[in-house]
């Protein structure tokens, strides 16, 4: 994951799936989109695809140092002078781990961080 060359123009990523072609247009990104995620197929009539993270280690193995780098990069986007407390929310599935990692990284520099998570299941 290298942020020294942020993306400046639109880039179209695509995947040829059994149920059709999926295209994603990325207009701006600090990191190269293909370094962050890939596409996967699902056997689900409501949504035949899944975006899988290359940096979270859930579906594709990732080095812990890469995971920490992504959490630190996201936490670094939160203004240091933001009035607290700061609430970080992980909403269902993969975002629960992402939120926990961002909270942990943010807690290195702030003592007023709170983390909440939710599930899509009751």
Language-model region placement:
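PRPP-associated nucleotide enzymes
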Residues: 1-122
């Amino acid at each position: 994951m290298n942020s020294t060359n942020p993306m400046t123009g639109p880039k179209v990523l695509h995947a040829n799936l059994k149920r059709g072609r999926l295209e994603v247009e990325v207009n701006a990104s600090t990191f190269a989109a293909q370094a962050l995620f890939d596409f996967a197929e699902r056997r689900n009539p409501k949504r035949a695809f899944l975006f899988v993270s290359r940096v979270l280690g859930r579906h594709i193995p990732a080095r812990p140092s890469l995971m920490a780098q992504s959490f630190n990069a996201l936490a670094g986007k939160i203004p240091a002078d933001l009035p607290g407390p700061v609430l970080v929310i992980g909403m269902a599935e993969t975002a629960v781990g992402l939120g926990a990692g961002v909270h942990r990284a943010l807690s290195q520099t702030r003592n007023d961080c709170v983390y909440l998570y939710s599930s899509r299941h009751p």
